[in-house]
């Protein structure tokens, strides 16, 4: 990965390079917000003291627009948008080099989706990280992507800059982005 033979690294060395925002947030319901954010900071090669981990958690929560007053709350006490922000804070807690975003706006209303997309774009640029996003949300694609790859049946059907997406001339891309039932992607009726 990025010129490093992963077979010659430890599991911790490999994982410390990555952050992940899961589709459903994947927050631990038995852990407070700050402990969710600090999950990777409390184990492995990046282990920090409890106080330092909490301090970093609060800093990352602030970065995603949440105040320290939610640090001791539990995920069930938060709205869906707040949970997504906590998940984003956890994804950046270790200052990773690469972040994966799996359907980052799933379950959010259009306004919160826009807020999360803006946060993702800002954070990726600010941290200078590589980001890979898996999404079917074309609003997210247009808001956060630089390069786009269209996958269908396990194959890349098209790859190119976001600016060329609507003029790709690719029938798979066109069917998907315009949401038509006619085209090479089989639909059920």
Locations of regions flagged by a protein language model:
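ABC ATPase NBD Q-loop/coupling interface
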Residues: 1-13
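Short coil-to-helix segment of the ABC ATPase nucleotide-binding domain corresponding to the Q-loop/switch region
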Residues: 31-39
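Conserved ABC ATPase "signature" region
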Residues: 50-69
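Conserved ABC ATPase signature
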Residues: 74-78, 82
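Conserved catalytic motifs of ABC-family nucleotide-binding domains
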Residues: 95
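Catalytic Walker B motif of ABC-type/P-loop ATPase nucleotide-binding domains
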Residues: 99-102
